[in-house]
């Protein structure tokens, strides 16, 4: 069939050949033109979609729905939290300052000075001698017998430590007044009735610290 078509083409007059060639060329140009047109339309459509996506992405937060609002920055949240905490911190500082008003720096200093003298000065030697004589003269108890049988250096240290404990219990470095001491003495009175040695030590501690309370 191809050979028959070729034979017919050879026998065809030259002017018909030209017409057919022109028609074929025109069809090719039209086909190419349609392809370019389709490609141009596709490009325009892509550009339009891209433009719409860009506009949608640049929408300001104020135009977003409430459920799509942008999250608050961490710094903003931290600032808000610090503002909420600030009154509490101020309250704590004021509370500490009010507690400081209940303390007497003068009494604290005098108490620490007295305790230091008991451990390092002649006052401590005089104290342990007095306590030893009073414990020796009192009615014998298991506690008194235990103290009297201690080695002298150990006994002196124990008596000084017990005296310090009573000083800090009765004075406490606060604005201690006589009525405060009386109240604290009443608190420990049942215990002192059972522990006569402790009562003797407490009495000597009070004798040493009375001037601090009366200041």
UniProtKB/Swiss-Prot annotation:
UniProt region (Involved in self-degradation and in host STAT1 degradation), positions on chain: 15-22
Annotated localization: Host cytoplasm
Comp. bias (Polar residues): 51-65
Domain of life: Viruses
PTM summary: Y1 and Y2 proteins are produced not only by alternative initiation, but also by proteolytic cleavage of C'. Only alternative initiation is detected in vitro, whereas in vivo cleavage seems to be predominant.
Leader peptide range in chain numbering: none
GO cellular component terms given for this protein: host cell cytoplasm
Record's function text: The different products prevent the establishment of cellular antiviral state by blocking the interferon-alpha/beta (IFN-alpha/beta) and IFN-gamma signaling pathways. They inhibit IFN-alpha/beta induced tyrosine phosphorylation of STAT1 and STAT2. Blocking the IFN-alpha/beta pathway requires binding to STAT1 in the cytoplasm. They inhibit IFN-gamma induced serine phosphorylation of STAT1. Block the IFN-gamma pathway by binding to and stabilizing the parallel form of the STAT1 dimer, further inducing high-molecular-weight complex formation and inhibition of transcription by IFN-gamma.
Similarity-based family: Belongs to the respirovirus protein C family.
Note: The C protein is found in virion at a ratio of approximately 40 molecules per virion, presumably associated with the nucleocapsid. The P/V/C gene has two overlapping open reading frames. One encodes the P/V/W proteins and the other the C/Y proteins.
Quaternary organization: The different isoforms interact (via C-terminus) with unphosphorylated and phosphorylated human STAT1 (via N-terminus), favoring the formation of parallel STAT1 homodimers. The different isoforms do not interact with host STAT2. C protein interacts with L protein; this interaction has an inhibitory effect on viral transcription and replication.
Name of this protein: Protein C'
Source species of the chain: Sendai virus (strain Harris) (SeV)
